[in-house]
């Protein structure tokens, strides 16, 4: 089965443009399914993936307390895989065409109030005053995530050339390799300049490459490290909810909307193909993004 999964992984990467995170999740889901099938019928092949078997696997997952969002993703993984396998001639028919995807409840993570966000950013700024390279980096992580609302994976994937400091713009590569331009404000610019001038040069090694953000050993920053930075920074604010980068992203979106930003503009800034249950997707110019961001974001 591993050779089949390798081929499927290549399909997800090259033809579907799925992220590394999504591909790892899908392959893990399929390995779970194959283990379930093998336990029931040792040595079974792809022909053993019938609709009743798929339903039994999902039922077992649900009974074990698997979250609805995870069940929805696993259903999607199976449906994508079986459709691909039929096209490749690996299966005679697609058993997942009638497999129902459990509806995932939409639950928004906790968000910061504007005063809590300000306190968190002030704390990060205070910690960076001594010029410690890691403190300068941590300040930039928190400041840029809140200023732009981008995903932590997008932030850690940025190269130096993706940043236009003079125009305060980021070129972000989002899900499905979709590129978008996101503005940021003056506080984020100050944090960025301090990092590029004093922080990054102190950590850079031959392995750094073009990466904007670096870990302590000079390699591209891992998103897990960035999550730790956000948790620790926000956790120091009295009364603030325990949030990570995703919560900071939702905080940025919430504060933009509170400031009067149009929902479709926020959708473009966040890189969503849909926002909530809507099907709207509106392309806006960089100038419009800049104007709305300056008017609506509390730290523009």
Swiss-Prot record:
Keyword Nucleotide-binding: no
Functional summary from the UniProt entry: Site-specific tyrosine recombinase, which acts by catalyzing the cutting and rejoining of the recombining DNA molecules. The XerC-XerD complex is essential to convert dimers of the bacterial chromosome into monomers to permit their segregation at cell division. It also contributes to the segregational stability of plasmids.
Family as reported in the entry's similarity comment: Belongs to the 'phage' integrase family. XerC subfamily.
Name listed for the protein in its UniProt record: Tyrosine recombinase XerC
Domain Tyr recombinase: 107-294
Gene: xerC
Keyword flag Cell division: yes
Catalytic site: 151, 175, 246, 249, 272, 281
CC terms in the record's Gene Ontology section: cytoplasm
Subunit structure: Forms a cyclic heterotetrameric complex composed of two molecules of XerC and two molecules of XerD.
GO biological process, one term: DNA transposition
Gene3D superfamilies on file: 1.10.150.130, Intergrase catalytic core (1.10.443.10)
Top-level taxon in the UniProt lineage: Bacteria
Domain Core-binding (CB), chain residue ranges per copy: 1-86
GO MF, any single term: tyrosine-based site-specific recombinase activity
CDD domains attached to this UniProt entry: INT_XerDC_C
Keyword annotations of the record: Cell cycle, Cell division, Chromosome partition, Cytoplasm, DNA integration, DNA recombination, DNA-binding
InterPro entries for the chain: CB, DNA_brk_join_enz, Integrase-like_cat_sf, Integrase_catalytic, Integrase_recombinase_N, Integrase_SAM-like_N, Tyrosine_recombinase_XerC/XerD, Tyrosine_recombinase_XerCD
Protein localization: Cytoplasm
């Amino acid at each position: 089965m591993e050779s089949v999964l390798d081929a499927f992984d290549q399909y997800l990467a090259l033809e579907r443009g799925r992220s590394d995170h999504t591909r790892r999740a899908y392959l893990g889901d399929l390995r779970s399914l194959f283990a379930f099938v093998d336990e029931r019928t040792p040595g079974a092949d792809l022909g053993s993936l019938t609709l009743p078997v798929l339903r039994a696997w999902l039922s077992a997952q649900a009974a074990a307390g698997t979250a609805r969002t995870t069940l929805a993703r696993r259903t999607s993984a199976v449906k994508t895989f079986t459709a691909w396998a039929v096209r490749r001639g690996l299966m005679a028919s697609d058993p997942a065409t009638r497999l129902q995807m459990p509806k995932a409840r939409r639950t928004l993570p906790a968000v910061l109030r504007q005063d809590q966000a300000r306190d968190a950013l002030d704390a990060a700024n205070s910690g960076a005053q001594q010029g410690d390279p890691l403190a300068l980096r941590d300040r930039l992580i928190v400041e840029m995530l809140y200023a732009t609302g981008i995903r932590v994976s997008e932030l850690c994937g940025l190269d130096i050339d993706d940043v236009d400091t003079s125009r305060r713009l980021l070129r972000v590569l989002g899900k499905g390799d979709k590129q978008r331009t996101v503005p940021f404000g003056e506080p984020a610019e100050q944090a960025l300049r301090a990092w590029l001038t004093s922080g990054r040069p102190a950590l850079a090694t031959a392995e750094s490459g073009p990466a904007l953000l670096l870990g302590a050993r000079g390699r591209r920053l891992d998103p897990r490290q960035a999550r730790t930075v956000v948790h620790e920074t926000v956790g120091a604010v009295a009364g603030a909810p325990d949030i990570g980068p995703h919560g900071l992203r939702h905080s940025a979106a919430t504060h933009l909307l509170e400031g009067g930003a149009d929902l479709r503009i926020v959708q473009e800034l966040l890189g969503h193909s849909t926002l909530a249950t809507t099907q709207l997707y509106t392309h806006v110019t960089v100038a419009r993004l800049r104007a709305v961001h300056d008017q609506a974001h509390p730290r523009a």
